[in-house]
């Protein structure tokens, strides 16, 4: 399942992202964060981390450096 999400992220980064203005307020970018999450954690944990990160991407959040957590133990 992780491989499917990684392919979707790859396609987004190669086919869609180049046509969108740069707007990510975080480092690493949300797509890179999601890629790292799916390379590190089981798909269900990576999915939750990615959704939470993307939900913070709005004008009222300051953004900045927000790396992937080293461990994720949410039950």
From Swiss-Prot:
This is Putative membrane protein insertion efficiency factor. PANTHER family: MEMBRANE PROTEIN INSERTION EFFICIENCY FACTOR-RELATED (PTHR33383:SF1). It comes from the Bacteria. SMART domains: Haemolytic. Keywords: Cell inner membrane, Cell membrane, Membrane. The keyword Cell division does not apply. The lineage of its organism: Bacteria, Pseudomonadati, Spirochaetota, Spirochaetia, Leptospirales. The keyword Disulfide bond does not apply. Could be involved in insertion of integral membrane proteins into the membrane. InterPro entries: Membr_insert_effic_factor_YidD. It is a peripheral membrane protein. Belongs to the UPF0161 family.
